[in-house]
């Protein structure tokens, strides 16, 4: 395997350098400082290769069935998210106390109902697209679905929300139950390129697959690439590295709705947006959290580029089976410019390894994040969730009947 060959070469090189030092190339007084940058990079490279090898050795694919018709890759997430309610069940009082933290939905007698006021209509539309085809197969149930960006049940807040509340993203500090975000069908951040949100994951998959095929690995630009707004200063060091070393990184800030002056783009004019398809021109793509998990991550993988994912606290339902060093390159929160430089330099020198990781990341998303996987996840989630209800669901006059939109009939 390629990783073993590279490790052996590095070991031989490191041992040779150690032997040379023992023969007097560095005096005892100089040992702490005489190693040059190539020595440092070799040691760094060895550590990275060791991490990759360890990750691959322990990695078990989530399904032996490439078709994975039962979306078994994501089943553990459902079990984990519902576990806090297994002992107590879900009572009517729990639903009522949680209602103000999300949008009330009800499935009753094979029909879907919702409270009339939806804070984000496009987001509700994206959710309802997946719920409507399922209602004929599901028992009666009440749901509280959060359409805000931020999860609602932080165990440290003590805000009275005991759940259950469904949210698209969370951290380990939250008890929200994750569901596939509305953006798989509608909504998402409104940008100049996508004024109504990215939407239609099925269509974007096909676009990115065609674009990636048109720009094979050997034709991609050997640069780190990022384009996005400054929703967090965690992204600043990559932008500053790009200004200092544009031969290594091409990263710039774009405008968002809160932009007022160049200070909001780190004292530079805002850059133009870049389509996901044009991200595929670059070998190394960076993903950062936003207010919560970033909607861009799943798109980046389909470029068949190497994804660098910064931070691991924010999750969506499919993140659990994406493994660091197997499918992507992990970085801790707030990486320094030096950390970016070292990793990019390493993967430039180990191009075949970079391509292998990129391919595994692409294959996982392509095989296990299809539209049928999204539908399957919703079905499995709701069938497991309804078993927790401890009361008989009743009709409510104040809820409105949701029917399929005309363009979905």
From Swiss-Prot:
The record marks 120, 230, 257 as: Interaction with the consensus sequence C-X-S-X-[PA]-C in peptide substrates. Protein O-glucosyltransferase. Catalyzes the reaction that attaches glucose through an O-glycosidic linkage to a conserved serine residue found in the consensus sequence C-X-S-X-[PA]-C in epidermal growth factor-like repeats. Regulates Notch signaling by glucosylating Notch in the ER, glucosylation is required for the correct folding and cleavage of Notch. Its EC number is 2.4.1.-. Disulfide bonds join 62-73, 71-376, 118-124, 280-303. Its main location: endoplasmic reticulum. This is O-glucosyltransferase rumi. The keyword Thylakoid does not apply. Keywords: Disulfide bond, Endoplasmic reticulum, Glycosyltransferase, Notch signaling pathway, Signal, Transferase. Residues 1-20 form the signal peptide. PANTHER family: KDEL LYS-ASP-GLU-LEU CONTAINING - RELATED (PTHR12203), PROTEIN O-GLUCOSYLTRANSFERASE 1 (PTHR12203:SF35). One of its GO terms (biological process) is protein O-linked glycosylation via serine. GO terms for molecular function: glucosyltransferase activity; UDP-glucosyltransferase activity; UDP-xylosyltransferase activity. The gene is rumi. The active site is at 149 (proton donor/acceptor). Residues 190-195 are annotated as: Interaction with the consensus sequence C-X-S-X-[PA]-C in peptide substrates. The keyword Flavoprotein does not apply. It comes from Drosophila pseudoobscura pseudoobscura. UDP-alpha-D-glucose binds at residues 227-231, 235, 274-276, 292-296. Belongs to the glycosyltransferase 90 family. Pathway: Protein modification; protein glycosylation. A motif (Prevents secretion from ER) lies at residues 406-409. One of its GO terms (cellular component) is endoplasmic reticulum lumen. It is found in: Endoplasmic reticulum lumen.
């Amino acid at each position: 395997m390629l990783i073993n060959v590279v490790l052996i070469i590095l070991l031989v090189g490191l041992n040779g350098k150690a032997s040379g030092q023992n023969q007097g190339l560095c005096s005892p007084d100089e040992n702490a400082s005489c190693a040059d940058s190539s020595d440092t990079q070799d040691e760094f490279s060895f550590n990275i290769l060791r991490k990759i090898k360890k990750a691959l050795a322990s990695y078990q694919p989530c399904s032996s069935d490439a078709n994975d018709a039962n979306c078994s890759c994501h089943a553990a997430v459902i079990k984990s998210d519902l576990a806090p309610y297994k002992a107590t069940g879900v009572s009517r009082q729990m639903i009522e106390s949680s209602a103000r933290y999300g949008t009330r939905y009800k499935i009753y007698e094979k029909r879907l109902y919702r409270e009339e006021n939806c804070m984000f209509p496009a987001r509700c539309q994206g959710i309802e697209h997946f719920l409507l085809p399922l209602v004929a197969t599901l028992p009666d149930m009440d749901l509280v679905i959060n359409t805000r960006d931020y999860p609602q049940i932080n165990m440290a807040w003590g805000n009275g929300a005991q759940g259950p509340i469904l949210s698209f993203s969370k951290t380990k500090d939250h008890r929200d139950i994750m569901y596939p975000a509305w953006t798989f069908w509608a909504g998402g951040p409104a940008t100049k390129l996508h004024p109504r949100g990215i939407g239609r994951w099925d269509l974007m998959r096909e676009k990115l697959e065609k674009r990636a095929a048109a720009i094979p690995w050997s034709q991609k630009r050997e640069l780190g690439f990022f384009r996005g707004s400054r929703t967090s200063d965690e992204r600043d060091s990559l932008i500053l590295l790009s200004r200092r070393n544009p031969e290594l990184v091409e990263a710039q800030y774009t405008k968002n709705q809160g932009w007022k002056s160049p200070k909001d783009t780190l004292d530079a004019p805002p850059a133009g947006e870049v389509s996901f398809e044009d991200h595929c021109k670059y070998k190394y793509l960076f993903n950062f959290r936003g207010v919560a998990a970033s909607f861009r991550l799943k798109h980046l993988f389909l470029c068949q580029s190497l994804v660098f994912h910064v931070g691991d606290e924010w999750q969506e339902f499919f993140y659990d089976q994406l493994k660091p060093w197997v499918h992507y390159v992990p970085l801790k929160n707030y990486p320094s410019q030096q950390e970016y430089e070292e990793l990019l330099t390493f993967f430039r020198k180990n191009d075949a390894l970079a391509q292998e990781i990129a391919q595994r990341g692409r294959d996982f998303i392509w095989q296990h994040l299809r539209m049928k996987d999204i539908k399957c996840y919703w079905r499995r989630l709701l069938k497991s969730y309804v078993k927790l209800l401890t009361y008989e669901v009743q009709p409510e006059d104040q809820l409105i009947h949701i029917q399929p939109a005309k363009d979905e009939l």
